[in-house]
Amino acid sequence: MPDDEPILEARELGRYVPATNKWLLQHVSLEVAAGERIVVVGPSGSGKTLLLRSLAWLDPLDAGTLYWRGRAVTRHVVPRFRSRVVYLHQRPALIAGTVAENLQYPFQFSVHRSRRFDAAQIEHWLRVLRREPDFLQKSSRDLSGGEAQITALLRAMQLTPDVLLLDEPTAALDPASAQGVEQCVSQWFQEAPQQRTIVWVSHDQEQAARMADRQLVMAAGRIVQGA
Amino acid sequence: MTYIDLTYTQVAAAALLILINGAISIALRLGMERTLAWASVRTVLQLWLVGLVLEWVFQVDRWYIVLALLTLMTLIAGITAGQRNRRRFPGIWFNTIVSLWAATWLTTAYVLLVVLQDTTSWYQPQYAIPLVGMVLGNSLNGTSIGLNSFTDTLVSHREQVEMALTLGASRWEAARTPVQHAVRTGMIPIINSMMVVGIVSLPGMMTGQLLSGTAPIAAVKYQIVIMFLIASATALCTVGVVLLSFLRLFNTEHQFLFRRISD
């Protein structure tokens, strides 16, 4: 693959609601290259979350095509695609059990069967985040919002995806927890800055400046700046 | 042994029992007298009508009439199973009707053709109609309970299901837990019945046979057959309806079509 070929390319994406005869996302075209850190900003309801969900192939599109490394995403590649382009919800969804069980959870899926849970890697990240190894034994029910988000991030990061799609991961967190999440994402990016890509939805202008080197502005379901 | 062929006077005497309910309603001011009277009238009329229909069907003894009656019964059961679901999605009726139809007809056919064998024809109304009726009534419960559980779990665990998809799970891997939970829940009533049958209560069919003079062991043998028939039909039906619903709510692109579910 030539270096300048985008990892993800959206062409004329559209999401339509027949009941209200309204396009929630329309004529959205976008190229995402390896090594980019993109932040998506815009008012509430402008389609930021829908854009991220569409880039993760989570919802059926009503228009347009999504390309992954130059090929259109089709049903045959979806689990593999999602193992390389990982979307994280604003509110982290964890399974019942310990943090360790949450981290091991993805390895039961056939797309990850050839891989193993790497405890050493997780412990390394925990040291960077100044967390004790016994964090792994905490029940997911006892985690604070920040800890839950970090668990969800670690669970995604250990899969070494090419792209992390982060949907306002710090919106519901206090400043200290938000800083932990930022640190976690930065750490993951810095480990291979030429290969890894972040698309981050944020309402926080300062955070956008800290975490991104390209800004997309959305309004009324379209990208109005930065595409 | 013989059975007592009831006269209309005897049936009327039994109707006096319903006066107890009326008296309770009046004494406690429950205001249920009208409902109770209407329910009693409906009981008599509905059973009377079904008796007349069955007499005619037994008399005529034609395969297409039996088949038409069984089809009608299956359709009504399928629609009822769908109606009992708190949530709706496109295709819910198709799912309940097809799964009830396939599961009850297949299992009943097995009992008629392989287990009973001695029936004069595969459609002999004396066997086919009550068996299908009993199986439908019980499978309907399993179907609606299983379907309810499936849609409820999908709605309450939407984030978990989507989280699995975002981490590379196939649609089946993402939905496996709600599917397993739904099938297990749908089968609880029949398993509970099997656990206590004969201890807590005597099943209706067995009671009927005993009243009509059948020897207890003969009635027990029939009841065992019926319990196994109902259990297998309920299992097949619950699995069928949950899997068909899974296919409606998760497309081949491994997307969870959450918006299809409405309250």
Language model segments and positions:
Chain A
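Helix-to-loop junction immediately C-terminal to a conserved catalytic motif
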Residues: A56
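Conserved ABC ATPase "signature" region
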Residues: R116-F135
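ABC ATPase C-loop
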Residues: A156-M157
